[in-house]
C-alpha cells in the first residue's frame, strides 16, 4: 500500500494558500467551532452516561445508569453541565482542526521541492500536534464538565452551583489541571489516529474517481468517514480516558487513586482487573460514530459556506 495520498485542503488545493494565511486560519477556526458544537449536541447524552459508568464505585451497566438518571434527574440530566462543553468543546475542536490544517500547510510547503503529497506519518504528525496543543485547553474544560456531570445533588444541595463556582473550587485546591498528562497522551495519539484515518478515507474516495474534488464529496459520506475516524480514535486511547476521568472525579483534598497515571492504573487494576479500564466503553463507541460524523460533516460544510 502506498504511503502517500493526495494532499487535499478542506475545500481548495493547499497550493492556493500561503503557509501563513490569516484569513484561512480564521475560517479553519470558525468551522472547527461549528463542528465542536455539533459534536456536543449529538454526543452529550452518551458522554454523561460514559462518565458515570467510568467513575461508578460499584459495578453497573449503561442501561442501569440511564434508568437511574431518568428516574432521579429526568431527561435534562443527560445534558447536565452542557454549557461548559458547548463553549469549551467548540473551542477545543476549533483548535484541533485549526492546528491540524496549519500543520498540513506547513508540510505541504516543506515538501514543495520533493512531492506535492503528504505521507502517512506527516498526516499523523499533523493530528498529534493539534491534539497536544488542544490538551492544555481540553484538560481543564473536561475537568469542570466531569465534576458537574457526576455530582448527584441539584439546586442548594449541589456541590457546585455552576461552572464558575466549580472552577473557583478547583483552583482553590490547585486541581484545575489534574489529569493533564493522560489528556496529552490521549489527545496526541488519538488525534493523530483521528485525522490520519479521515484523510486516508478522503484520499481513497478522491482516487476512485478522476477529477473528483473534495468539495464534491456528499455530506453522508463525510459523516461515514467521520464516524469511522472517531471509532478508530477511541479504540486507540480508551484506557487513558478512563484513567483521566478517575483522576478528575477523585477527592480534591485527598485523592484515593493518587495523582499519577501509574498509581491510578495500579489501583484500578487491583480493584477491577483489565475490565476496569473499559468501563463505559459501550456508550463511548455508540457515541463515537454519530458525534464524530456530525463533527466532520459540519466542519467541511461550514468550510464550503465560508469559501
UniProtKB/Swiss-Prot annotation:
Membrane topology: Multi-pass membrane protein
SUPFAM superfamilies: Mitochondrial carrier (SSF103506)
TM helices/strands, residue ranges: 29-49, 83-103, 118-138, 183-203, 223-243, 277-298
Keyword Heme (UniProt): no
Pfam families listed in its UniProt record: Mito_carr
GO terms for MF: glycine transmembrane transporter activity; organic acid transmembrane transporter activity
Family: Belongs to the mitochondrial carrier (TC 2.A.29) family.
PANTHER family membership: CARRIER PROTEIN YMC2, MITOCHONDRIAL-RELATED, MITOCHONDRIAL BASIC AMINO ACIDS TRANSPORTER-RELATED
Name of the molecule in the record: Mitochondrial glycine transporter YMC1
Organism annotation: Saccharomyces cerevisiae (strain ATCC 204508 / S288c)
The encoding gene: YMC1
Amino acid at each position: 500500500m502506498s504511503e502517500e495520498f493526495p494532499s487535499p485542503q478542506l475545500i481548495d488545493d493547499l497550493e492556493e494558500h500561503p503557509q501563513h494565511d490569516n484569513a484561512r486560519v480564521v475560517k479553519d477556526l470558525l468551522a472547527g467551532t461549528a463542528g465542536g458544537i455539533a459534536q456536543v449536541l449529538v454526543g452529550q447524552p452518551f458522554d454523561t452516561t460514559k462518565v458515570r459508568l467510568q467513575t461508578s464505585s460499584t459495578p453497573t451497566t449503561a442501561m442501569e445508569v440511564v434508568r437511574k438518571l431518568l428516574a432521579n434527574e429526568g431527561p435534562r440530566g443527560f445534558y447536565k453541565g452542557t454549557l461548559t462543553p458547548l463553549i469549551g468543546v467548540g473551542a477545543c475542536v476549533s483548535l484541533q482542526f485549526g492546528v491540524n490544517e496549519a500543520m498540513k500547510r506547513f508540510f505541504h510547503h516543506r515538501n514543495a521541492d520533493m512531492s506535492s503529497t503528504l505521507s502517512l506519518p506527516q498526516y499523523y504528525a499533523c493530528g498529534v500536534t493539534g491534539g497536544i496543543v488542544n490538551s492544555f485547553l481540553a484538560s481543564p474544560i473536561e475537568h469542570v464538565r466531569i465534576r458537574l456531570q457526576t455530582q448527584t445533588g441539584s439546586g442548594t444541595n449541589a456541590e457546585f452551583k455552576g461552572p464558575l463556582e466549580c472552577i473557583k473550587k478547583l483552583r482553590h485546591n490547585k486541581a484545575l489541571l489534574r489529569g493533564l498528562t493522560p489528556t496529552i497522551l490521549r489527545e496526541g495519539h488519538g488525534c493523530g489516529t483521528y485525522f490520519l484515518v479521515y484523510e486516508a478515507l478522503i484520499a481513497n474516495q478522491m482516487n476512485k474517481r478522476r477529477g473528483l474534488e473534495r468539495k464534491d464529496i456528499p455530506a453522508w459520506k463525510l459523516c461515514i468517514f467521520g464516524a469511522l475516524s472517531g471509532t478508530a480514535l477511541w479504540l486507540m486511547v480508551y484506557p487513558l480516558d478512563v484513567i483521566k476521568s478517575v483522576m478528575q472525579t477523585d477527592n480534591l483534598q485527598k485523592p484515593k487513586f493518587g495523582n499519577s497515571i501509574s498509581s491510578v492504573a495500579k489501583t484500578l487494576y487491583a480493584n477491577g482487573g483489565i475490565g476496569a479500564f473499559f468501563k463505559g466503553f459501550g456508550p463511548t463507541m455508540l457515541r463515537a460514530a454519530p458525534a464524530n460524523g456530525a463533527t466532520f460533516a459540519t466542519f467541511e460544510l461550514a468550510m464550503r459556506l465560508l469559501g
